[in-house]
Amino acid sequence: MEIYIFIGVFLLLITCIAPRDKTVFYFFCILFAMIGLFRSHNVGTDCIAYSSAFRKITLNPNTWNLILPFEPGFNVLCALFKQYISSSPMLLWGIMSAFYTFNMGRFFRKYTSNINIALLLFYLLGTYMFSFNIIRQSFAFALLLVSFSAMNIEELRIRDFFKCMLVIVVCAILFHSVMYALLVVPFVALYMKKWNISKRFLFFMLAMSFLAFYFNVAVNYVMGFVDQTGLEGKLINYAIRNAQIGEDSGYSILKVTFVSVWAAFLIKMCPVKTDLFLTLYIIGVVILNSFGNLVVEFARVYEIFNVFGIIYMARIWSMKRIGLQLYLYRIGVIIYSVVLFVNLLIKNYGEIVPYEFRF
């Protein structure tokens, strides 16, 4: 845990002094890549199971999916790596983690000038550890970031719209089906190129999803009580199963509430014309609130959309505002990210603590 805290404090102090310094940015990108590259198999949820599956995979399709079901592209990648580069699964997972980090950095450079603020949030909000815990999904998302960085999704042309759709579908088919959720990105980007989505509408979506979340929580407790009285039935059992808080996702009732309140604050901070990245982030929070307690994959979808929120939060770090309002926002960002970071370490979501080197 100490290494995570030391890096977080060090990055926080430097970032507040130099939010746009490229030397600092490249240094931490390389550091993060090295940490991901040289971690042991005990760091991250997927590593042990994925490594067992990797050892079975060859270029013969009959050896695929014997332990875990992988998409065909991921099976081929593992087989080719094992055949021609190395039989070490941790080397492949480490390279994927570094690939994820570098493409995230490229994405930040494309869409915000406050690159170190984005990198700080990337680390403190746990998005960096995403590549430790959800290997296929983070790699698929990194491939999409290559496309998002190559084009300007804020000024999406019709031709780029179809390219973006194609890349998302291909990544979803070959590497991880959760990427289908990102099909909303080109549609929202194309819509917002001509029309604005009002802050009031974003508030409405957020509020409705928040109410839906607490309705599910209430159903969970009520049905649990009814179940204890012996009044069981198919409908009751169905309601209980579908109202559980997704413990695997690491999102408790308090944490979802915290995220939702922060999302409302970000909408309030937005100028008259809403930002594409804010809109995408709010969509992610709505997905978390509405469906994250039903299926853990929806909580993972939120983690992807959280990257768009990082861009927005980094952008308004230096927005021209009345002095006090801007400083309150900066303090709020630091408190929000530090609270989630501490929660991440204490609860050890994804088995990232303690950090161990592979050698």
Residue ranges and their predicted role:
Residues 163-176, 182-188, 285-289:
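Membrane-interface alpha helices of multi-pass inner-membrane proteins
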Residues 42-50, 65-76:
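Extracytoplasmic catalytic/substrate-binding loops of multi-pass membrane glycan-assembly enzymes
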Residues 95-111:
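Transmembrane-helix motifs of polytopic, lipid-linked glycan transferases
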